[in-house]
Amino acid sequence: MRAPSFPERGTVKSETKAAAKGGITTLFEMPISNPCMSNAAEFASRKKHFLENTYINFAFIPALGKLTDLNLQNLVNSGAIAFKVFTIAPPPNRKSEFDGLCFTTEEKILKALKHAKKSNLITIFHAEDQLMLDSHKQYENKYKKNDPKVHNATRPILAEASARIGRVAL
């Protein structure tokens, strides 16, 4: 949902009401918002917003944020059920939405994994190979800006498969 940011895309009320009507009873909210949910203060702010507006149960999966023991413990104590890691760079002009979420080199990804392991929680990946995405960016100009075909042209399935193999190896 990315709430409370971007209400034009949907709000906690609108999206959880729709979920409830469809029989969904629980939502796991990811960290992307503005700012990214990567520290206890932002976790608390979003939790308060959800408590005041939801129709269903919810839990949060924050970003790791700063790789300090204090930040990790504060997120765990706040109620994190898992952590989310992106293996690609944030989109241009959206860095604050991804702050503490993106780790793009094997060294940084491994460091993030070792840090997350201290929490004894699951770590979830958005796994794509940044180098492969960079090499396919050239195909972006073949399509109009909002053409859905640009996604497949610039984000080949091999970029995800390659990244997943790399994460398993780590």
Enumerate the predicted regions with their spans:
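Active-site mouth loops of central-metabolism enzymes
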Residues: M1-G10, I56-T68, F98-C102, A153-L158
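Residue-level recognition of alpha-helix initiation/capping sites
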Residues: R9-G10, A41, K66, E107, ...
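A generic structural signal for alpha->beta connector loops
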Residues: I24, Y55-N57, N120
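Histidine/acidic residue-rich metal-binding segments in metalloenzymes
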Residues: L70-V85, A89-L170
